[in-house]
């Protein structure tokens, strides 16, 4: 009963809380930051030596440093190894019920290397459920059947189920036909799945008719969005959720907004011209685990300052992938220059006959390219060479490679940089 009340309180509080200006939002953030940072210095040994409650006094952590300090960044002193052991055992059983010291333990996909580990207490799960419902449901009065296709489920998602909301987790590890059948049987009104799954379902399950469709857990490419929208007859929205928090969601106008009411976002700009940045986030509500000045590995392209929905929350034009996968080339004028994955995707997928591709950059800047269908290899090569020349970059060796073996639960990485 207590958890349901927490969920209801979070739902109502989030749904009806409106910020009339950026100033009002920033006042809310400052209040929450004061509470979070003051508690962090008291509760988490990692921050015991931090001299003040000023956010700038706290170090910026990436995944490696955060995992290295894991036992000092959770309020139970749990070690990384014991949490990993519990979570991996649960994943092998496909049960996703791992728990250590009363905290649920979940794993990230490990796209950027080592898997992240997240801990949630029952009260945090209840609050997350309320916030998610408030932001994702088009109506609070109409019944909803919510289907989520993901690599892993667990208490964090199960906490949504009940009452007027029916929830169904579908295991991404299932064969595509089985996923489609389970969704047909459930007939969701709201469907959330990785973009490649949505793309497959359009062809495989024409009888599915969700009223709302969310792309989750991977980069939504333009050509996939067009096919999915045409297939389901509704716009594809995005839900930006990571191990580190509920980071953003599309509004009714299709604009992706950062959840700045839940997380404080600092921007590490990586391209001055476009404003592309890597977010450094501080969770304003999490308690079991410290997410303070955590550098995400994503590259975000800022959106317009204003949105027709009237929200003052910052907008994102596109989530472009991992910062680690920004390609690096020698410029013809000298020096090194980045090439963002979004440009590569657009050019290669726009080449004649190309349906899909995988591109890997080696430490020596050479490229390995796999293309579907195989007969499109030459046109993909030419398109890639043309892009590099147009950007004023030295064209390295480009070699064809076999299509890589990919687990069905793995995130799709079309563009990847090694080393």
Task: Label every PLM stretch briefly.
Residues 1-31, 35-38, 165-419:
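Active-site glycine/GP-rich loop and adjacent strand/helix microenvironment
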Residues 119-120, 158-160, 203, 291-293:
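A short secondary-structure junction signal
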Residues 116-117, 126-128, 153-159, 200-201, ...:
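Short, well-ordered, mixed-charge alpha-helical segments that flank or form enzyme active sites
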Residues 133-170:
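Conserved AMP-binding loop of ANL adenylate-forming enzymes
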Residues 1-107, 113-127, 133-138, 152, ...:
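Nucleotide 5′-phosphate-binding alpha/beta core
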Residues 114, 141-144, 187-188:
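Short coil/turn connectors at secondary-structure junctions
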Residues 108-112, 162-164, 209:
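Acidic/polar active-site rim loop that often engages polyanionic ligands
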Residues 119-121, 148-150, 194-195, 240:
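Glycine-rich, histidine-containing beta strand-loop boundary motifs that form or position
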């Amino acid at each position: 009963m207590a958890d349901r009340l927490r969920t209801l309180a979070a739902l109502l509080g989030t749904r009806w809380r409106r910020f009339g200006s950026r100033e009002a939002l920033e006042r809310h953030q400052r209040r929450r930051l004061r509470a979070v940072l003051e508690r962090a210095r008291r509760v988490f040994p990692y921050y015991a030596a931090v001299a003040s409650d000023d956010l700038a006094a706290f170090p910026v952590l990436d995944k490696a440093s955060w995992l290295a300090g894991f036992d000092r960044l959770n309020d139970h002193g749990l070690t990384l190894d014991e949490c990993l052991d519990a979570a991996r055992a649960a994943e092998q059983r496909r049960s996703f019920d791992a728990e250590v010291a009363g905290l649920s333990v979940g794993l990230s996909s490990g796209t950027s290397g080592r898997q992240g580990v997240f801990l949630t207490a029952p009260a945090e799960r209840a609050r997350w459920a309320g916030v998610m419902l408030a932001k994702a449901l088009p109506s609070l009065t109409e019944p909803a059947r919510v289907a989520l296709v993901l690599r892993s489920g667990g208490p964090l998602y199960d906490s949504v189920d009940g009452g007027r909301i029916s929830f169904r987790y579908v295991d991404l590890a299932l064969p595509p036909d089985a996923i489609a059948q389970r969704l047909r049987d459930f007939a969701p009104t709201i469907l959330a799945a990785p973009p490649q799954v949505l793309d497959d379902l359009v062809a495989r399950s024409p009888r599915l008719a969700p009223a709302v469709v969310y792309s989750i857990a991977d980069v939504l490419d333009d050509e996939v969005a067009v096919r999915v929208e045409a297939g389901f007859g509704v716009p594809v929205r995005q839900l930006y959720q990571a191990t580190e928090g509920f980071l953003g969601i599309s509004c009714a106008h299709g604009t992706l907004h950062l959840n700045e009411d839940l997380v404080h976002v600092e921007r590490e700009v990586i391209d001055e011209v476009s404003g592309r940045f890597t977010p450094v986030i501080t969770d304003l509500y999490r308690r079991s685990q410290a997410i303070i000045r955590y550098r995400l590995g994503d590259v975000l392209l800022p959106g317009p300052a204003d949105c027709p929905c009237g929200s003052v929350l910052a907008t994102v034009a596109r989530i472009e992938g991992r910062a680690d996968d920004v390609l690096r080339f020698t410029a013809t004028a000298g020096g090194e220059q980045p090439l963002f994955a979004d440009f590569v995707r657009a050019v290669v997928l726009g080449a004649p006959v190309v349906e899909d591709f995988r591109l890997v950059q080696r430490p020596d800047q050479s490229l390995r390219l796999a293309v579907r269908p195989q007969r499109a290899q030459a046109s993909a090569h030419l398109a890639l060479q043309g892009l590099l020349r147009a950007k004023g970059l030295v064209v390295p060796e480009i070699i064809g490679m076999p299509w890589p073996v990919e687990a069905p639960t793995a995130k799709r990485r079309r563009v990847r940089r090694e080393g």
